[in-house]
Amino acid sequence: MEGIRQYWKRTDKFYLLLCIFSSTMAVVALASWATKQGNGFAVDELTGAITGIGDYRRAVVQGGAAVLGLCVALLLSCIDYRSLVKVWPVHVAVTWGLVLPPLFIRNVRIGPLTIGYNAGDTDNYSWYKLAGFTFQPTELAKISFILTFAMHLNNVRSRINEPKELAKLLLHLLAPIAIIHVQGDDGTAIIYGIIGCCMMFAAGLSWKYIIGAIAAAGAAVAAAFAFFSDKIGKGYQWYRILAVIDPENTTGWAPNEATWKNIIYQQQRGEIAIGSGGIFGNGLFSGRYYSVPNAHNDFFLSWIGNVAGFVGCCVVLGVLLALVIKTFATGARSEDLLGSYICAGIGGALMAQIAVNVGMNLRVLPVIGVTLPFYSAGGSSVLMLYICVGLVLSVYMHNTKSLFG
């Protein structure tokens, strides 16, 4: 009992409560979504008897993953994050040993396990499926990347602006991005890029490199649209980008009306769902709702807007913003730069996922399969999030410097 009291005294209680609040609200909202489907429970068509939890399964999995994740986070917070960085060969071998097979193996079943599983209607085969549960190893590899990149930055912190060292850092960053891109998961690849940029910025990367990189990226995008738009490709990813720029297809980017309607349908329905909720929403378990494809996943914010309105969205995003700020603040108060870089990476990941997901739901960014942290359905992603929470708490608990002292 004394140990629990001492832990509670040392840990970041507010950070933990923000995470628990987010997970609780996610489970309630997913239960609401299941209810509104009209078949939350699985029912026998002949007898009408309830035979299973049906769509409520997502809420149950989300809640179970949150409880398990919280336990892992509490355990992880008791371990000094420096010791986790030191065993980098172990977690690099494990995580990337899981990431690489789907590059060469697609939809291959070995007993109950499927390697290279496609969890949607895209070209992304980076998943594993085991006994009905899916897992994306790039989420676990993201944590390993943050730890190893933080170690790399810590080792070269006084030489980060030397071209030779910067080139090595960029190779460290671009290698996993390239692998994930080849797997067809550009959304996750973009998140990795933002994580790396946040960590290098925290390490003191010169503004001349930052401004130069932004200018080069802008020029590359402009050139792609101006000179190579007809050669880049006509796949769904390119169409999704063009759908944001020209949603009415006035330039004729879609080859036919069916393709145009299919590409814009999800975001169009998401906009309608958010708008229909008004200020206070249509009610969590009562009232009308608008069907949105993947409303339980990438477009969960549109569901929250539908049932809880503008106020509900503000509460959800406000709590997530507080989590991001607290993560960066923990890094700022770290006694060593290693802890600062880890928190910068985790804070950057949260910030990027929130910003991209909100942009997708509001139709200001293309749909690239980025979920809303804590809220979008997915047990493995919730578990990975809580591992990140554990790392942030570890930095908090194993440092004593005041943020302003």
Where are each of the predicted segments found?
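Hydrophobic alpha-helical segments of polytopic membrane proteins
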Residues: V67, C71, P89-W96, P163-H181, ...
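Hydrophobic, glycine- and aromatic-enriched re-entrant/interface helices and adjoining loop segments
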Residues: P112, N118-W127, G212-V315, L337-G339
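Loop-to-helix entry and N-terminal half of a specific, functionally important transmembrane alpha helix
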Residues: T330-G369
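Transmembrane alpha-helices of multi-pass, membrane-embedded glycan-processing enzymes
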Residues: L68, V92, V316-L323
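Membrane-helix boundary/helix-loop-helix interface segments in multi-pass membrane proteins
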Residues: E2-K9, K13-Y15, S22, V28-L30, ...
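Hydrophobic alpha-helical segments of membrane proteins
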Residues: V182, D186, I190, G281, ...
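Alpha-helical transmembrane segments of multi-pass membrane proteins, especially transporters
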Residues: K164-L169, A213, V244, Y290, ...
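Interfacial segments of multi-pass membrane proteins
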Residues: I190, I195-Y209, F285-G312, V370-L385
